[in-house]
UniProtKB/Swiss-Prot annotation:
Transmembrane segments: none
Keywords, alphabetical: ATP-binding, Cytoplasm, Developmental protein, Differentiation, Helicase, Hydrolase, Meiosis, Nucleotide-binding, Nucleus, RNA-mediated gene silencing, Spermatogenesis
Broad enzyme group: hydrolase
Stated family: Belongs to the DEAD box helicase family. DEAH subfamily.
Recorded catalytic activity of this chain's protein: ATP + H2O = ADP + phosphate + H(+)
Subcellular location: Cytoplasm; Nucleus
Stored SUPFAM superfamilies: P-loop containing nucleoside triphosphate hydrolases, Tudor/PWWP/MBT
Assembly and binders: Interacts with piRNA-associated proteins PIWIL1 and PIWIL4.
The protein's name: ATP-dependent RNA helicase TDRD9
Single GO biological process annotation from the record: male meiotic nuclear division
UniProt domain Helicase C-terminal: residue ranges: 378-545
GO CC terms in record: cytosol; nucleoplasm; nucleus; piP-body
Length: 1383
């Protein structure tokens, strides 16, 4: 035995690779320097092949083997090197066990602890309880004796033998009868299993749930200090043990379903095994399973006894509840006739196999009849109790399909229940209820019912032998759920669900020979196929040595390359520190950072945990907690199959103008919270109705609220608190907060960065035939004479928005939606929704006539001239007219006769966008005459109900005189409407009963109000950040510049009836002031390129006004050909309307809608740069249409999570956020949040041209550390040393709020934290909000992309080491090293 061990010696003793010095052994004389201990000499003789160097070092030293030279940049050797690392660390562990074997605890039965008085004596269970007659009950005393006599016992028994429910009760009753203390924990792999078993026991024993028996699953804990038997999930127990670094809280640990080789299960076994051999040797551990590989587990928990490893005791529970017969497809020849071969590499359920399952369910009535002894059976003679059927399917999609097949069988009297992870507790309970008499219960389940849920009345199991497993793509490390064949172990577990109360039947829907030859025996352990991030963080918290040293002792150790990769990913996220000296970077270990400690305690992914911490840093913790909670659980937004478009529109509404799925979650959650706080959702029905109206699942949003509170509680131990909500006086605060939150999302989800390809403007303009891309979509495969069906086409798009016009042009049609003239320039939501319809593959069908039929029945075939005629249907004017074919995009309103105009501004829409009218004499006279003519007539009320887009007459009072003017209705609200006066450009609220019908003659004159947009200007970064596209300050300044006096405008171009102009203001005798120049000078705006259409219009206008306007042909003059087309068109439309053509007898399927400005996404990381990228259809950004195609600056998208398809060729992005369109934003954010960066310089070394971001370069191996995630960017704005310094200052500001140590952030007061948060916020805003915008440059790509170490070391400006020893900093962000530029 050991004598006089200090605390440090104890810590070193249980840490692999540490040296323990000055140790004396009792009973042995001190060894001379040249003499090895006797036990070790004896051991070396017995194990001659063991490494002699290792023998000489034990027991006083356990040295880790030298780190292999290969790192991430170089390929690892074959499997032999993987086994070498495992064997070396296992040898070290065995050497430690030699010491353990010298001091074994006494074995044998006996109670180890005195009675611990319960706080409530009445809680002591009755010992007269009669246990159910299950196989485990026959060997009750023997099992209890084994458990008390052995440290570890393995119980192997058939499903239904009573292991999970009865055995823990036996131990509890055994201790109670002896008035001895016990505290028993039983793990279950799934929440539903832990909660349902605890509920069943409490009901069976008539105990209060949460008294003697309780459960803890995730956030929910139903237990008290009196609880002596608690069921919990594997993860909950693991978290408890890792935090305590001991098992001593419990007397007995039952680990159920150990055959389910999840990552948590394997790590729990590792930790329990480790602690059993160190500081928790009196705890009893029981492993249980129906399909366990007993020898593997027994050897794993072996202990040294007299220099031999003694396996753990295995106890076989004899007997099964009832016999279970197995059948395969070969045995079902009477209902299965397909001869399709089954292939291991193609797991799939074919339609005929679904039909086999349905046929089986129908046949069970005959089987029940035969077993009951009845000779006849009729439809009316159903027995009152029909046995239940459990069907195992791989996922929710398959469950829904099978559910639909079964619900169509109404006459068969079936009650069908789905059972999967997203089912609520109430829905889960339905599975356990008895069916209505005469009905058969059918349970459609994923593998959740394989082991976690036992439905006692199941007699039939139908198993498709499939499952979905989470795997990691080998190249990208992104996860994907893959359909695969279930293992024989899992299928046997499923079979065991039958036969609980009577003889059972199991039908495996695969051929018998396929089962024998292809189905794998065991499932591949998760530790060998899934990310190890959370496991390695827990290893670091345990502080028992290098992760590879501890994981080498796992039941199925992960490969060294997987450990190495996970360590690098944890360094990338910031959970482990990046070494300041890159050559010292240990690819197998790292220092745990403050962030890493937080992540290890949070029940969310590493990136979501980082989101919470960065939210704390930048003062948006509340929003980040909501997002982290929402993204960790099932999405509470619902998009029903038939109402997907409505659900999508609702989600877009919640996101506002942010274009962020994450911000939509925040706004929806807060809207729900606000309604509850106002008392609007007191009744459950009111809350459910609110959820249905807003496409939100109430049960799921409640779960988010619970997790939000849990996260809030957990981070409080790290001195992070959600601050009180004070009223904010700064009007720009909400916009700044939104931007900061978007930046925090980018920081948390680095490197999930994406950009968009640029559309070809010239091709897009041609494809749209000059139509406005912000209001128009294109349809293809239009049938001949498509204009006849314009009403059908209008109705197809009714759910998108108000259709203004449809232009039919051969086999194409252009659908244009109405734009509110008082809203800013942007792609209409209707256009996004229309393109979304195409993405959802919504069928667009028209009921049509054959072209030959039309030509044969109307005008003797003369209408054939209209077959290729371009026709415009104007719903506003209610006209259908032929159009002249034109390829000219020039839009020249007849109201503009000169390029210089004097105007009055009547309505400012936003900065640079306004309405006005000309104030020259000619126009003033025209408006005066028009007003007089309108007001001379006897006006009549509207014949139809007012609706948006309707043109009518509305009153307006000017100089105390009320007159009627032409107006367009914008909105209708109650008894009033907002109208827009189309000849002046202003708007007003008018009572509905004051609106009048407009006579037809007043619709012919073009509207005289003009819409203007200042050319070559866009909002600055400051305006984008501090407002809704433009800041409040910019709005105020622009309104002051254009209001109160006439303006001179110089027309640059006319695009889609909008005049792009330069605006000049005269003030007194001074020269004219260019409004754009003022806004740029004051930092509200910056110069921008005009679009291709605008530049084309400029050239045409320049030539047009160079000639005499009088010599130009008048496009309004009618030609005889056009009149003839009009006549034929009218005849054809009348024939169609009067049904002379008869009922349509054909269907035409249209293709589209399309918009040529729709953007495609691509990744910025090296590994994914050329992979196809898809955004999930539920995301707001599943449709992105360019608002400013002339702006060539990169637009950035951030994804919260990524997955890949089964081949790894396509990436799927989830929960995306479109970042503000700020020049240089992708580069600045990448440099701000990258662990390491290397700047690129031009050939002369005078300016920075780009940056390479990632984990950097290892000079020792001469290879990049994590090349797959490297991001190469070329700057599109000029960045200099000052920008790099600003980024470093901001990184240092972040570090101050997330640091360890005695002066760390855990010990800061609230005032100091608030001060540091405000400092970080201001530094962040200052990085982007500059008075003078960064200069735009043409991107120059580096000649050696993704190559590190390209800078001359003499030009690198080394940063001062942070506080602490060099290279040992645990800061979240290291400071970047700028490159010295030549003068």
């Amino acid at each position: 035995m050991l004598r006089k061990l200090t605390v440090d010696q104890i810590n070193d003793w249980f840490t692999i690779g540490k040296t323990v010095t000055n140790v004396e052994l009792l009973g042995l004389p001190p060894a001379f320097p040249a003499e090895a201990p006797r036990e070790e000499v004896q051991r070396s003789e017995e194990v001659p092949n063991e490494d002699p160097t290792a023998q000489a070092q034990v027991p006083v030293k356990a040295t880790a083997p030298a780190r292999p030279a290969s790192t991430s940049g170089r390929s690892l050797s074959q499997r032999s090197s993987e086994m070498e690392y495992i064997n070396k660390y296992r040898q070290l562990e065995e050497q430690e066990l030699d010491i353990y074997g010298q001091d074994q605890p006494p074995s044998g039965p006996g109670l180890r602890s005195p009675l611990a008085k319960l706080s409530n004596v009445a809680c002591i269970p009755e010992t007269t309880y009669k246990y159910p007659d299950l196989p485990i009950n026959r060997c009750k005393e023997e099992v209890i004796s084994l458990i008390e006599s052995n440290s570890v016992v393995i119980i192997h028994g058939a499903t239904g033998s009573g292991k999970s429910t009865q055995l823990p009760q036996y131990v509890l009753d055994h201790y109670t009868q002896r008035s001895a203390f016990c505290n028993i924990v039983v793990t279950q792999p799934r929440k539903i299993g832990a909660s349902s078993i605890a509920r069943w026991i409490s009901k069976e024993r008539s105990w209060t749930l949460g008294g003697l028996v309780g459960y803890q699953v995730g956030l929910e804990k139903i237990a008290t200090e009196d609880t002596r038997l608690i069921y919990m999930t594997t993860g909950v127990l693991l978290q408890k043990i890792v935090s305590a670094k001991s098992l001593m809280e419990f007397t007995h640990i039952f680990i159920d379903e150990v055959h389910e080789r999840t990552e948590e299960m394997d790590f729990l076994l590792l930790v329990v095994r480790k602690l059993l051999r160190t500081n928790s040797r009196f705890v009893k551990v029981v492993l249980m399973s129906a399909t366990i590989n007993c020898k593997q587990f027994a050897d794993y928990f072996a202990v040294p006894v007299q220099n031999k490893m003694n396996p753990a005791y295995v106890f076989e529970v004899e007997g099964k509840p009832h016999a279970i017969e197995e059948y395969y497809l070969n045995d079902l020849g009477h209902i299965y006739h397909s001869g399709l071969p089954y292939r291991l590499e193609e797991p799939v359920i074919t339609k005929d196999v679904y039909e086999v399952a349905v046929s089986l369910i129908q046949m069970f009535d005959d089987l029940d009849m035969k077993e009951s002894g009845n000779k006849t059976w009729s439809g009316a003679q159903f027995v009152s109790e029909r046995s239940s059927v459990l069907v195992f399917l791989p996922g929710l999609g398959e469950i829904n399909y099978m559910h639909e097949l079964l619900t169509n069988m109404i006459h068969k009297r079936l009650q069908v229940y789905p059972l999967h992870s997203s089912v609520t507790l109430e829905e889960q309970n339905n599975v356990f209820l008895s069916p209505v008499p005469g009905y058969r219960k059918i349970i459609l389940s994923t593998n959740i019912a394989e082991s976690s849920v036992t439905v006692p009345d199941v007699k039939y199991v139908i198993d498709f032998c499939l499952t979905r497993t989470l795997v990691c793509d080998e190249d990208t490390n992104y996860q994907s759920l893959r359909l695969s064949w279930a293992s024989k172990t899992s299928c046997d577990q499923r079979k065991g669900r039958a036969g609980r109360v009577s003889k059972g039947y199991c039908y495996r829907l695969i051929p018998r020979d396929f089962w024998d030859s292809a189905i794998p025996d065991h499932v591949v352990p998760e530790m060998l196929r899934c990310p190890l991030g959370s496991t390695i963080l827990k290893v670091k918290l345990l502080d028992m040595g290098e992760p590879r040293a501890l994981l080498a002792t796992a039941l199925s150790p992960p490969s060294l390359s997987d450990i190495e990769r996970t360590i690098l990913l944890l360094k990338e996220v910031g959970a482990l520190a990046v070494s300041g000296q890159r050559e010292d970077e240990n690819p197998h270990d790292g220092e745990l950072t403050f962030l890493g400690r937080v992540l290890a305690q949070l029940p969310v992914s590493q990136q979501l945990g980082k989101l919470v911490v960065l939210g704390h840093v930048f003062g948006c913790l509340d929003e980040c907690l909501i997002i982290a909670a929402a993204l960790s659980l099932k999405n509470f937004f619902t998009m029903p199959f038939r109402q997907h478009l409505d659900g999508y529109r609702n989600k877009v509404h919640f996101s506002g103008s942010s274009r962020s799925d994450c911000l939509a979650l925040v706004e929806a959650f807060r809207a729900w919270q606000a309604c509850r706080q106002r008392g609007e959702l007191r009744r459950p029905k009111d809350e459910l109705d609110w959820g249905r109206l807003n496409y939100i699942q109430i049960k799921r949003i409640r779960e988010v609220a619970e997790l939000y509170e849990e996260l809030k509680n957990r981070i409080s131990q790290f001195n992070m608190f959600v601050g009180p909500h004070h009223p904010v006086l700064d009007q720009e605060y909400p916009y700044k907060q939104r931007f900061i939150l978007q930046v925090v999302l980018a920081g948390a989800f680095y490197p999930n960065y994406f950009t968009f390809g640029q559309p070809d403007e010239e091709m897009a303009v041609r494809e749209l035939a000059g139509k406005d891309p912000k209001t128009t979509v294109v349809l293809k495969h239009i049938p001949p004479y498509g204009f006849l069906y314009y009403k059908q086409l209008q109705s197809l798009f009714r759910q998108c928005g108000q259709v203004k016009s449809i232009v039919f042009d051969g086999a194409k049609a252009f659908v244009e939606f109405s734009r509110n003239p008082t809203e800013r320039f942007k792609t209409l939501p209707a256009v996004n929704l229309a393109v979304k319809m195409s993405q959802l593959k919504v069928s667009l069908e028209l009921s049509v006539h054959a072209a030959e039929e039309i030509e044969g029945k109307v005008q003797g075939g003369s209408v054939s001239k209209l077959r290729n005629t371009r026709v415009n249907v104007d719903f506003q004017k209610q006209t259908v007219d032929p159009m002249q074919v034109s390829f000219n995009t020039l839009d020249r309103p007849r109201t503009v006769a000169d390029l210089l105009l004097t105007i009055d501004v009547t309505e400012v829409v936003e900065v640079g966008h306004f309405w006005g009218y000309r104030i020259d004499e000619r126009n003033a006279e025209l408006l005066k005459q028009l007003t007089a003519e309108i007001n001379r007539l006897e006006l009549v009320p509207l014949p139809i109900h007012p609706h948006p887009d309707l043109v009518c007459l509305a009153p307006f009072t000017d100089y105390n005189k009320e007159s009627y003017f032409r107006a367009q209705i914008l909105y209708v609200s109650g008894n009033s409407a907002e109208v827009f006066f189309v000849d002046y450009g202003n708007r007003s609220h008018v009572d509905l009963d004051l609106l009048r019908e407009i006579p037809c003659q007043f619709l012919e004159l073009p509207f005289q109000a003009l819409e203007f947009k200042i050319c070559k200007m866009r909002p600055s970064a400051k305006s984008l950040i501090c407002g809704e596209h433009w800041s409040g300050g910019a709005h105020g300044r622009f309104a002051a510049l254009v209001g109160g006096c006439p303006l001179l405008v110089k027309v640059f171009s006319i695009v889609h009836s909008v005049l792009h102009v330069d605006v000049y203001r005269y003030s007194g005798a001074q020269d004219a002031v260019n409004v754009r120049d003022v806004l740029i000078r004051e930092g509200y705006a910056e110069l921008a390129e005009e679009s291709y259409e605008s530049k084309q219009s400029y050239e045409v206008l320049k030539g047009f006004f160079a000639k005499s306007v009088d010599t130009m042909p008048d496009g309004s003059v009618s030609s005889p050909l056009k009149d003839d087309e009009k006549h034929l068109l009218r005849i054809l439309l009348e024939s169609f309307a009067s049904n002379r053509l008869g009922a349509p007898n054909c269907k035409a399927v249209l293709h589209g809608p399309f918009n040529p400005y729709e953007l495609k996404c691509h990744s910025l990381t090296r590994i994914s740069k050329f992979r196809c990228v898809w955004i999930e259809k539920e995301s707001i950004n599943s449709v992105v249409i360019s608002d400013s195609p002339a702006d060539l600056h990169q637009r950035m998208l951030v994804a919260a999570s990524l997955s890949v398809n089964e081949t790894g060729s396509t990436m799927l992005l989830r929960e995306t956020s479109l970042m503000p369109h700020i020049p240089g934003l992708p580069a600045l954010l990448s440099m701000l949040f990258a662990p390491v960066m290397e700047l690129r310089v031009d050939r002369e070394g005078k300016c920075y041209t780009g940056v390479l971001c990632g984990l950097g370069w290892n000079s020792a191996t001469e290879a990049p550390i994590l090349p797959e995630h490297d991001i190469e960017l070329a700057f599109d704005v000029r960045l200099n040393v000052e920008d790099i310094v600003e980024i470093n200052i901001l990184r240092a500001a972040i570090n101050k709020l997330v640091c360890d140590g005695p002066n760390g952030s855990k010990y800061l007061g609230p005032e100091r934290i608030a001060q540091l948060q405000e400092n970080a916020r201001q530094k962040l805003l200052g990085l982007f909000c500059r008075l003078k915008p960064r200069e735009k440059i043409t991107p120059q790509w580096h000649e050696k992309p993704y190559e590190w170490n390209q800078v001359d070391p003499r030009l690198i400006m080394e940063q001062a080491e942070p506080e602490g020893s060099p290279g040992k900093s645990t800061s979240l962000y290291q400071l970047h090293t700028p490159v010295v530029l030549s003068p």
